């Protein structure tokens, strides 16, 4: 798709999602700014990196100056989310309400809460009972209300657990791929024989870019393209085939520190551990039908992720 003449796309948050979105938008020919508090990091072709703080309306206004479309990919550590994320929403919503920029929000599955294995679609009721799930549901209600009341133009894209290049803090991230490559121990969270959806971070980026290019998607929640759910054991087996040896899994059947998942993280994540004790199956067919964007096969995503981690570990070894 060709870029809209003169349109500026501004991405808030330079984690794996924000960085991937910025790169995807640049690949599509858009003018792109990537904003985080530091304004530094790896050089990205076609992306202008700037420092900004979206914790206040004034800060958010400065960050999105001149933007036609804003992508909210900001996240914070689990133990800070309940205190910090509502304020960021207030600031970002307030800023786009003043400027008229469209807002595309990266969202989670937390509002659904425990599903007892029910396939999650955009029509699944929001039954969150955890503090973080209720917080995310309240944020989403605010976004949709702002759109309905014509205070802002908003689209929400929900993702399952991330996997892919640059993804570290995920259950299929830095706890798994380095150990797979080196023969170390891989945590097997909960019941790995349950089906579990994982979203390629590159598909997340493509999906959010499509929402940014298509106002017809505004005013609702979408499930971003996600490959059919597989059991985590099947994914570990496929990963073992790619690295040439079976993974050395260690069962973690309750939330406790393991590897990169320290005590602070696990204590905060404990209320969401149900995601590993019941099937987590996300269906993205509505998005696929509407926008014609299919998810990447999980085997391809695993190969892409391994390639990135090989480079990541090699670069770290030289430091």
Predicted regions, residues:
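NAD(P)-dependent short-chain dehydrogenase/reductase
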Residues: 149, 160-195, 239
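Substrate-binding strand-loop-helix patch
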Residues: 195-202, 222-242, 296
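Amphipathic terminal alpha-helices
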Residues: 288, 297-319
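Glycine/proline-rich active-site loop of Rossmann-fold NAD(P)-dependent oxidoreductases
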Residues: 164-175, 211-222, 245
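Conserved beta-loop-beta element that borders a ligand/cofactor-binding pocket
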Residues: 108, 141-166
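Terminal hydrophobic/aromatic helix or amphipathic segment near a protein terminus
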Residues: 234-281, 314-319
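Conserved Rossmann-fold NAD(P)-dependent oxidoreductase catalytic core, especially the SDR/UDP-sugar
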Residues: 90-138
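NAD(P)H-binding glycine-rich loop region in Rossmannoid oxidoreductase-like domains
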Residues: 40-41, 47-99
């Amino acid at each position: 798709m060709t870029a809209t003449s003169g349109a500026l796309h501004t991405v808030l948050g330079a984690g794996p999602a924000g960085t991937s979105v910025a790169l995807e938008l640049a690949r599509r020919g858009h003018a792109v700014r990537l904003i985080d508090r530091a304004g530094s990091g790896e050089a990205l072709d076609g992306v202008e990196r700037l420092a900004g703080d979206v914790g206040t309306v004034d800060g958010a206004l400065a960050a999105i100056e001149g933007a036609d479309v804003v992508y909210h990919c900001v996240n914070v550590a689990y133990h800070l989310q309940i205190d910090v994320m509502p304020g960021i929403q207030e600031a970002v919503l307030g800023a786009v309400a003043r400027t008229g920029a469209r807002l595309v929000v990266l969202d989670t599955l937390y509002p659904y809460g425990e599903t007892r294995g029910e396939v999650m679609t955009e029509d699944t009721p929001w039954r969150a009972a955890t503090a973080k799930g209720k917080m995310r549901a309240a944020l989403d209600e605010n976004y949709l209300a702002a759109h309905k009341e014509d205070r802002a133009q908003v689209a929400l894209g929900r993702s399952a657990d991330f996997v892919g290049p640059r993804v570290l803090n995920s259950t299929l991230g830095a706890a798994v791929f380095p150990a797979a490559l080196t023969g170390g121990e891989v945590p097997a969270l909960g019941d790995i024989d349950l089906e579990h959806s994982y979203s390629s971070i590159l598909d997340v980026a493509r999906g959010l870019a499509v929402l940014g290019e298509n106002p017809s998607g505004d005013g609702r929640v979408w499930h971003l393209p996600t490959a059919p759910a597989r059991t985590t054991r099947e994914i570990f087996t496929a990963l073992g085939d790619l690295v040439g040896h079976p993974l050395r899994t260690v069962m973690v059947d309750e939330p406790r520190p393991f590897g990169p998942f320290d005590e602070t993280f696990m204590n905060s994540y404990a209320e969401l551990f149900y995601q590993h004790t019941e099937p987590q199956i996300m269906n993205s067919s509505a998005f696929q039908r509407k926008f014609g964007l299919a998810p990447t096969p999980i085997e391809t995503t695993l190969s892409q992720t391994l390639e990135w981690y090989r480079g990541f570990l090699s670069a770290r070894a030289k430091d």
